[in-house]
């Protein structure tokens, strides 16, 4: 039941693969070599007393042959795109990936320092060293093959009745949280956000999106065929005969397809109100008798009287479906999922099989990342904050944190001014919006309180697989211990070294880890236009999430509570629907259009970030004579800096995959489509009606 996941509240990340599911996916992303080659920006090290000037915008990254009025994305990024063809190990490579590679190399340097000397058992340094060395030890993992799975597979073979099945599901879910049939966890009650409650969430399908199972397109059929071939491959590696492997693979896909029919779509999962359904266990069990809900919780040893059945209609349909499902089919389904979930933790032939489907076919990658990189990622998934504590001491300065606090406050002022200027919003709603804005909890760099790993039993006497299981148990136990207790608002959902940012509605907090606070996002030595166009828009983006189609359902205290007048809400929703339709009209690949409903929240946040960051820049430059740099005005540098954040090369397979499941628009759309709605952009680059970047004023949509 690996990889490692555990329950967590909904968060709104800036760029990364969605954390919209109830589980928080641990989405973490040699230093000496980088320093020797002069690749690492000097301003990254907190140990330096003086930093060299780093240009805010590299002219060679641009393509000046392209008119900004026709394709601003290409104008700003064309040079970089040409110089950086897609690397074989990537399905998408851009600015975020460069910074993640840098952070990963920094973490590698930290880890390799630890393994070079003896460590005291029971310390975080020891845990890091053991896990990293075992992850690197392919010879031992290859020697073991699928042996680590044998106890689990034998337990599955022993299932003969629904009672046996219930015991197995309860046992596995107590350890892993996100089970094969449905997920569970502990998170804040969205209508009483100071307290934690138990919740159920729908199944996490093997392919990530229900579209693959419910669509009858040639693409979907091809993906399902590849998925079946992958399952057969890993089942045969696990000792099953050709006939057994074929039967189990077909049963796995058949059951996933049945579950997909009543699973919520990725767009529906964004609907906060639709995904909040508090029900007593007694009432739900009385009305839904196909699955023994009370017995399930009892077998897990959990005292739960009330829970949030997040996707309530899924669970009602699931209960009915389960009552008629055959034990042998469910056993086969669990077998397929158990092996697939463990594949990356087993021998190289399993890892290769997993990559050949999920990496190559589904995403278009050509090769795996090197083993050291994969091993660093494993350690970060398990011990992210332990590594982060070392990381921030080396690579994040107090001056950077102070400057970020200043920028955040400037953006708050700009958003406050913007709210007051909205012509469509009533004074009553404006007052409550201002209250929410002034109540933002701001987290920058790293947490004040670090995670306690003392209960994590990682030991060199155990196998790699056993240590990963111990880590999974630790994280699941860490989540479950919060049941019925007050929410710990000091916790972070990301490690400090992550190149990302998020907004959390139930705590009304915005968080900017140290990893993203480096060039080109944040540069202590660059001019204001570049910083406001980059990290300023990021700050504004996260702030605007508090007021997007989801965040706007939560009040200043983090509770799902309507603070709008009916008329204002109606105007807001009408405007956001115009934005959704605008993005949905854009073709992203042959025969495929963007999903403006799925990406609505992120598109609102992008446009809000652009609007208020530019206003903040104007406020910062008020009364100043600001000269051009490299021939560009501050306004032009602002928009170029923003566009540079999203420059990337990407495979068509990844475009198609992300369009199905990612609530973020593709980089091209985050530049060209977003900027078409921003009036100051037209003035900055003299956009005229005959230009391709032009849309008529009546068709432009800006919510905030």
Model region roles, listed by residue range:
Residues 41-47:
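Boundary at the C-terminal end of the N-terminal hydrophobic targeting segment
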Residues 113-406, 410:
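Noncatalytic, helix-rich "gating/capping" subdomain that lines the substrate-entry/channel surface
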Residues 61-82, 213, 217-237, 600, ...:
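Hydrophobic/aromatic-rich, well-ordered segments within soluble, folded domains that form packed cores
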């Amino acid at each position: 039941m690996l990889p490692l996941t555990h329950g967590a509240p909904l968060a709104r990340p800036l760029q990364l693969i969605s954390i919209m599911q109830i589980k928080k996916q641990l989405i973490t992303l040699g230093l000496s070599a980088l320093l020797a080659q002069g690749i690492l920006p000097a301003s990254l090290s907190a140990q330096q007393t003086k930093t060299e000037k780093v240009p805010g915008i590299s002219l060679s990254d641009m393509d000046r042959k392209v008119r900004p009025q026709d394709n601003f994305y290409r104008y700003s990024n064309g040079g970089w795109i040409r110089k950086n063809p897609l690397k074989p190990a990537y399905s998408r490579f851009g600015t975020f990936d460069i910074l993640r590679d840098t952070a990963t190399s920094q973490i590698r340097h930290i880890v390799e320092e630890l393994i070079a000397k003896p460590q005291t058992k029971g310390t975080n340094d020891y845990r890091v060293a053991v896990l990293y060395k075992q992850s690197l030890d392919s010879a031992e993992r290859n020697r073991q093959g699928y042996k680590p799975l044998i106890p689990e597979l034998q337990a599955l073979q022993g299932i003969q009745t629904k009672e046996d099945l219930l015991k197995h599901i309860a046992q596995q879910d107590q350890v892993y949280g996100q089970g094969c049939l449905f997920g569970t966890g502990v998170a804040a009650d969205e209508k009483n956000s100071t307290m934690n409650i138990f919740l159920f969430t729908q199944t996490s399908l093997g392919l990530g999106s229900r579209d693959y199972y419910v669509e009858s397109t040639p693409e979907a059929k091809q993906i399902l065929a590849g998925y079946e071939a992958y399952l057969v491959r890993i089942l045969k590696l696990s000792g099953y005969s050709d006939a057994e492997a074929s039967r189990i693979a077909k049963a796995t896909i058949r059951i996933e397809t049945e579950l997909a029919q009543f699973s919520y779509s990725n767009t529906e999962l964004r609907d906060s109100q639709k995904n909040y359904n508090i029900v007593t266990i007694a009432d739900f069990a009385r009305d839904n008798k196909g699955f023994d809900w009370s017995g399930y919780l009892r077998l897990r040893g959990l005292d739960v009287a009330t829970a949030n059945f997040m996707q309530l209609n899924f669970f009602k349909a699931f209960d009915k479906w389960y009552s008629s499902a055959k034990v042998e089919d469910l056993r086969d389904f669990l077998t397929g999922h158990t092996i697939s979930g463990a594949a990356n933790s087993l021998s190289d032939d399993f890892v290769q099989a997993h990559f050949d489907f999920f990496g190559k076919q589904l995403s278009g990658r050509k090769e795996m990342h090197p083993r050291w990189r994969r091993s660093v990622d494993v350690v970060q998934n398990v011990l992210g904050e332990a590594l982060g504590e070392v990381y921030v001491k080396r690579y994040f300065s107090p001056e950077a944190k102070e400057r970020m606090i200043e920028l955040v406050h400037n953006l708050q002022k700009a958003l406050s001014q913007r709210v007051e200027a909205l012509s469509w919003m009533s004074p009553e709603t404006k007052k409550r919006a201002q209250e929410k804005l002034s109540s933002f909890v701001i987290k920058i760099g790293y947490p004040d309180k670090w995670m306690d790993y003392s209960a994590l039993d990682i030991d060199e006497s155990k196998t790699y697989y056993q240590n990963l299981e111990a880590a999974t148990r630790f994280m699941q136990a860490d989540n479950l211990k919060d049941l019925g207790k007050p929410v710990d608002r000091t916790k972070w959902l990301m490690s400090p070294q992550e190149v990302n940012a998020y907004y959390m509605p139930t705590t009304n907090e915005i968080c900017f880890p140290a990893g993203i606070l480096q060039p080109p996002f944040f540069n202590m030595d660059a001019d204001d236009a570049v910083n406001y166009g980059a990290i300023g828009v990021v700050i504004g983006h996260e702030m605007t999430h508090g007021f997007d189609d989801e965040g706007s359902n939560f009040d200043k205290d983090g509770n799902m509570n309507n603070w709008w007048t009916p008329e204002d809400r109606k105007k807001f929703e009408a405007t956001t629907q115009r934005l959704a339709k605008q993005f949905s009209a854009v073709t992203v690949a042959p025969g495929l259009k963007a999903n403006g409903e799925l990406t609505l929240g992120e598109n609102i946040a992008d446009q809000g970030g652009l609007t208020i960051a530019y206003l903040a820049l104007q406020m910062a430059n008020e009364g100043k004579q600001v000269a051009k740099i490299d021939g560009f005005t501050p306004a032009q540098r602002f928009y170029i800096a923003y566009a540079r954040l999203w420059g990337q090369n990407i495979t068509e397979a990844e475009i198609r995959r992300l369009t199905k499941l990612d609530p973020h628009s593709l980089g091209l759309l985050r530049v060209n489509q977003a900027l078409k709605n921003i009036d100051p952009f037209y003035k900055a680059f003299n956009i005229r009606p005959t230009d391709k970047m032009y849309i008529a004023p009546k068709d432009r949509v800006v919510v905030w």
